[in-house]
Amino acid sequence: MRKQLSVGITFGLIFLSIAVTAVVTVLAMQHKTNDVLGDLPEKMARYEMLDEVDSIISEHYYGSNDQKVLRHAVANGYVCGLNDGFSRLLTSEEYAQYLAVNRGQMQGVGLSYHKTDSGSLKVDTVSGGSPAAKAGIKKGDEIVAVDAIVLDLSNCDEIAQKLENPSVLSVSLTFRHKGQETTVDLEKGYEAASVSSESYQNIGYIRISEFYDSTASQVQETVDLFLASGVRALILDVRDNASTNIENAISTLDVFVPLNQEAPAATLLNKAGETVTAFSTSAGEVNLPMAVLVSKGTQSAGELFACDLRDFGKAQLVGQKTAGNALVGQSFRLSDGDSLLLSVGVMMPYKSDSFNQAGLLPDVEAELNEKTEKITKDSQFLAAASLFTE
């Protein structure tokens, strides 16, 4: 037979529960209040100068101002004060472009250039796979007219904006190559090529400039072709690769290394040192001698890729000490539609200690004697190739 509590005891327990809850709530609120009050002087000092500047501008500034622009500038200045290369504030349009570029989706025609003394545009680089490349424009060519308007010193800067303006979807270019002028119509937008390759004395060379969504599949296709041709070694070039896309870097790494068994292939740690994400590799691998070319400009996902290849025992590093940037970024959407990019953690490689600020020391140090597009004149490439010819 179940015993029932009396009404008095029941109400007493209810009141006791309410009292305990109230005490706990008060203590929690007091703790939170103490934290807030403790931060109050710092917060007041933080905004005191801004309030003072705002007051002076409101009273004395002769011109007009756009409050939204001012708010964005203030927030952007705050972020810039972090002195962090990744962290920044982007408008909604800038953020959309940032995402597209990270995926390898470019908006322009694939040219970089500089203005000549006559007002024409001298082509410095042509992106592989771009509309300009497909139209036959080469490095060193001159753009002499845009949309049938001949370029000169008086109009060059204004007319050239048509090449950069994302709202202009197509453009007609007249370019001069070895004295001959050609006019082409170009549609803007293309998927950037991040992988190029060639052979040297039965050694396969693969240049990886970025880690885009399509990079891993491009690398896999290139490796398959090299394996079918019977190359005896591979040289992977990630010099100046400063990509921040870790997931794509691990997907590309997966082409070369086996299943990670001792630890995650890469681990992302937050501010508290807690694991946020752990990346793995699959069972496939390449069983050839390999070297990785690195430089002072190799950083972030480029460094992780190189470090992991060495940690897996698959490759030696050749070149210069790398940049030492292992910070991980995250985007935060703000209430006005802007986005905040912020460094929120650090990436850890397969076995090595963190390379953040320390960089990666190459197994074989080699300086680049000159900037060249020919690997046969590339001193760092030749230093790597010598590992497989001795």
What is each of the regions a protein language model found here?
Residues 199-215:
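STAS-typified acidic loop motif
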Residues 54, 132-156, 234-237, 317:
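Conserved PDZ fold ligand-binding element
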Residues 58-121, 170-172, 176-185:
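Extended, small/polar residue-biased N-terminal targeting/export presequences
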